[in-house]
Regions:
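N-terminal positive-inside, membrane-proximal cytosolic segments immediately preceding the first
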Residues: 1-3
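Solvent-exposed, non-transmembrane regions of membrane-associated and secreted proteins
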Residues: 5-195
């Protein structure tokens, strides 16, 4: 019986690993494209609902809790737009890993109490380009009552994933964050209300 050369084993193993890496890359790109397409469909539905709001029974001071609209079994609180990176996405009312695969999610707070925190996957079609934002870039959050909230980026930082207090109680009106590609840290964007 003939001995297998260690060099041949290394070559075969290398090819297998390259194929696995290529497969993982293709899977991630497909998941990103699917999430982006699904989010754009929801944005169109949300915009239609905001343009044709149902009449309210009473008027008065705004409830600090954001109004929710259900689309395809998911609840949404609004739409986020970041022109500098070409983002226009729906925002789900509650955070969970399965929801993050569809759209950004509110994790804490409200635009009505100036402590809104929104998380999203680092898909290119979601928050994958947050690192390219700079101080002064504009961000808009429109809630389901059609109230437009204008923000301006104050700073962009990379934080430890356990920095929950720094995010939840940041003192900023809006905080956006996503994982870095390795998943060990979080790209975090702190925004103030626009003047």
């Amino acid at each position: 019986m003939r001995k297998v050369s260690p060099g041949l084993v290394c070559i075969v193993l290398g090819v297998v690993l390259l194929l696995a890496a290529g497969g993982l890359y293709a899977y991630n790109r497909c998941e990103d494209a699917h999430a982006g397409a699904e989010a754009q469909t929801v944005v169109a539905d949300l915009q239609q609902k905001v343009e044709n709001p149902e009449p309210e029974a009473e008027s008065g001071p705004l409830d600090p809790e954001l109004p929710v609209v259900e689309i395809d079994g998911n609840e949404y609180v609004g739409e986020i737009s970041i022109p500098a990176i070409g983002i226009d996405l729906p925002v789900m009312s509650e955070w969970s890993y399965p929801r993050l695969k569809i759209a950004p999610c509110r994790q804490f707070g409200s635009s009505r109490t100036d402590d809104l925190v929104i998380a999203a996957h680092n898909y290119e079609s979601h928050f994958g380009k947050l690192t390219s934002l700079t101080a002064g870039d504009s961000v808009t959050f429109t809630d389901m009552d059609g109230i437009v909230n204008e923000y301006v980026v104050n700073k962009v930082e990379v934080l430890d994933p356990h920095s929950v207090e720094e995010v939840e109680h940041s003192g900023y009106a809006l905080v956006l964050y996503t994982c870095t590609y390795g998943g060990k840290t979080r790209v975090t964007v702190f925004c103030d209300r626009a003047s």
